[in-house]
Regions:
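Cyclic nucleotide-binding regulatory domains
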Residues: 26, 51-111
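Cyclic nucleotide-binding regulatory module and flanking cytosolic helices
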Residues: 1-49, 92-94, 99
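Polybasic "coupling" helices that flank or enter modular domains
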Residues: 131-202
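Phosphate-/nucleic-acid-contacting segments
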Residues: 172-262
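Residues that recognize and position ribonucleotide moieties
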Residues: 45, 64, 86, 107, ...
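Cyclic-nucleotide recognition modules
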Residues: 86-145, 149
C-alpha cells in the first residue's frame, strides 16, 4: 500500500491562467462577484501518488476540483485488502460539505494537481449565497453517480465489459466539461497507469491490453497511444459494456465522429 507523502502546496490564489479559466467555466452560472470571491479563496496544490486527502471516519478539511490525476474512493476490507468503490478524475469535485466524517479513504491513485478551497471558507460562501447551493446538489448527485457507476462497472463478468464500462464513464464525464461539444471527437487520457488500472478493474495488465484492442477492432474506440483513446463508435462501446451506465446527464446520446471525422 502506498504511504502518504508530503504534498507541495502552491501559494494562495490560483496562480494559473488555466485553473482560473477552469474555475470560471465550472461556476459560470454564478454572478461575476461570486466567482471573483471564490477565485480569491482558491489555491493550487500538487499531491503525490498515495497521498490521502481524508481517511475513513475523518472530516474533510478541503474541497475542490481535480485538474489532473485521479483520486480513489477506497474502503479497507476486514482482511486488510483495499477495495475501490469509486474513482474521481479530471474536473470532478471532491470533498463533503455540511456533513459528518467521510465514509471512505480518498487517496491519490496517481500524481494529482488540485484546485482546492478551505472547507470552512467554502461552506461559509455557500451559506451566504443561495445561488451557490446548486453546487451542493450537483456535488451530492455526482458522488451518488460515482458510487453507482463503479458498482455497475464491477458487476461485469467479462474483462472487456468492465473496461468498456470504465471508458464510458470517462467519456460521459468528458462531455460534461466546459467548452466540450457533444458532436465533436473527444480525446481522453487514462487517468492512471495501465498496470494500476488493471488492478482496480480486477484483472491483469495483459488482459486489459487485450480488452482495449478488442474494443478497437470492434470499432468502439481508437487507441491514439497506449494511454489515450477516442470513442468512435458509441453504440458499440455501450453494447460492449453490457450495463445500463449511460448517458443520463450528458444530454442524450451524442453523435460521435468516425475515424475520418473532425
Amino acid at each position: 500500500m502506498a504511504m502518504d507523502r508530503p504534498a507541495s502546496p502552491r501559494p494562495s490564489g490560483t496562480g494559473s491562467a488555466s485553473a482560473h479559466a477552469l474555475l470560471r467555466g465550472l461556476l459560470k452560472t454564478l454572478p461575476e462577484a461570486q466567482r471573483d470571491e471564490l477565485d480569491g479563496l482558491a489555491r493550487l496544490r500538487d499531491i503525490a501518488e498515495g497521498t490521502a486527502l481524508v481517511r475513513e471516519g475523518e472530516r474533510y478539511r478541503t474541497v475542490g476540483y481535480i485538474l489532473s490525476g485521479a483520486l480513489g474512493m477506497q474502503k479497507t476490507l476486514p482482511d486488510g485488502r483495499l477495495h475501490v468503490i469509486g474513482l474521481l478524475v479530471q474536473h470532478d469535485m471532491f470533498g463533503r460539505l455540511f456533513d459528518g466524517p467521510s465514509g471512505f479513504d480518498l487517496v491519490a491513485l496517481a500524481p494529482a494537481h488540485l484546485l482546492e478551497f478551505d472547507r470552512d471558507a467554502f461552506e461559509s460562501f455557500v451559506a451566504r449565497h443561495p445561488e451557490a447551493q446548486q453546487l451542493l446538489l450537483t456535488r451530492i448527485l455526482d458522488e451518488i453517480d460515482t458510487a453507482r457507476e463503479w458498482l455497475l462497472l464491477m458487476s461485469g463478468h467479462k474483462v472487456v465489459e468492465r473496461v468498456a464500462a470504465f471508458l464510458l464513464i470517462l467519456f460521459r464525464r468528458a462531455l460534461r466539461q466546459p467548452g466540450q461539444a457533444g458532436d465533436r471527437r473527444v480525446r481522453i487520457a487514462l487517468p492512471v497507469r495501465r498496470v494500476d488500472l488493471a488492478h482496480y478493474l480486477g484483472t491483469r495488465p495483459e488482459s486489459l491490453s487485450r480488452a482495449l484492442h478488442d474494443l478497437q477492432r470492434a470499432g468502439a474506440i481508437h487507441l491514439v497511444d497506449p494511454n489515450t483513446f477516442e470513442v468512435i463508435g458509441l453504440r458499440a462501446l455501450v453494447d460492449a459494456a453490457g450495463s445500463d451506465l449511460l448517458l443520463s446527464g450528458a444530454g442524450g446520446e451524442p453523435r460521435v465522429a468516425g475515424p475520418g471525422g473532425g
